[in-house]
Amino acid sequence: MRRVTLTQFLIEQQRAGRVSADLRLLIEVVARAVKAISVNVSKGALAGVLGEAGTDNVQGEAQKKLDVIANEILLQANEWGGHLAAMASEEVETVHQIPFDYPKGGYLLLFDPLDGSSNIDVNISVGTIFSVLRFPEGEAEPTEQSFMQPGREQVAAGYAVYGPSTQLVLTVGHGVHAFTLDREMGSFIYTHPFMTIPDDTHEFAINASNARFWEEPVQRYVGELQAGKTGPRGKDFNMRWVASMVADVHRILTRGGIFMYPLDEKCRAQGGKLRLMYEANPMAMLVEQAGGAATTGRERILDLMPTKLHQRVPVILGSRNEVERVTAYHRES
């Protein structure tokens, strides 16, 4: 059986008119950066990359050494290619401009360089999330405003999960496809075509330690799940929580489920916990392309108009029937 590489897959997408040559090359550069990050993650303590870096990011969170390393790898890999007008990183406060001595292109790249980095020191799966937008026509120079586009305008989105194997999960608007890194070949191999999320599920992911802070619709929904066969749902559910969005969403894309980081009293002043541009939008695009749904509990995530680069929102995504049920509970409240 012929093994198809990521490059071959993207060339076929280009021939079918689904991606431009520049977008294809941009995704390949991101994939090369992912390989480099994967090497650093897998070495761990052997390379002295565990622990905190001694600095805080724009979110006020203590950075891990690998946060800083992954961020630099992505910035440096993508600066020179000529495909980008600018970049934005969850770890950096302002827009990252392309140096003057490099050519500029027609796309904007956003990324969370190392999602779930609090898990690094305990050897649990982490990941990289990315999103691609078009640079608005008619603008001379990219600014923060250039990035203020709803998630439905994304032309590509994806993530890498660094687990027992490294996988790159990608959509360019025509289904969700996963590629597994063959370390001997040095290539991503097409292993999971057209990933789909079932409409129904028996698994849910939420940080139950925050239960006392949840709004009533979420308390009602989770309470019904916990009641199991003897409750209103008439079946048992299992709870899963990795505290790494990439790992939790990857499980949902693989076998279904619902992921929730809802609005609660702890994060109400911030608008939510997760970042719209770096986490919610790309994951929402992937989930919808796989047949699932993604909302804040009140609105479709991909319809939200961002107002700032590091905006936070509630996130509820996964199996369509469950997401619609939670959203209905919010409407009723």
From Swiss-Prot:
EC supergroup of this enzyme: hydrolase
Binding-site residues for substrate, renumbered to this chain: 115-118, 207, 273
Subcellular location: Cytoplasm
Cellular component per GO, a single term: cytosol
Cofactor detail note: Binds 2 magnesium ions per subunit.
Gene Ontology MF term list: fructose 1,6-bisphosphate 1-phosphatase activity; magnesium ion binding
Residues holding Mg(2+) 2: 112, 115, 279
Catalytic activity, reaction form: beta-D-fructose 1,6-bisphosphate + H2O = beta-D-fructose 6-phosphate + phosphate
Biological pathway: Carbohydrate biosynthesis; gluconeogenesis
This protein's UniProt keywords: Carbohydrate metabolism, Cytoplasm, Hydrolase, Magnesium, Metal-binding
Residues at which Mg(2+) 1 binds: 90, 112, 114
EC numbers: 3.1.3.11
Gene Ontology BP annotations: fructose 1,6-bisphosphate metabolic process; fructose 6-phosphate metabolic process; fructose metabolic process; gluconeogenesis; sucrose biosynthetic process
Gene3D superfamilies per record: 3.40.190.80, Fructose-1,6-Bisphosphatase, subunit A, domain 1
UniProt cross-references to PANTHER family, sorted A to Z: FRUCTOSE-1,6-BISPHOSPHATASE-RELATED, SEDOHEPTULOSE-1,7-BISPHOSPHATASE, CHLOROPLASTIC
Family designation: Belongs to the FBPase class 1 family.
Protein name: Fructose-1,6-bisphosphatase class 1
Species whose genome carries this gene: Azoarcus sp. (strain BH72)
Gene that encodes the chain: fbp
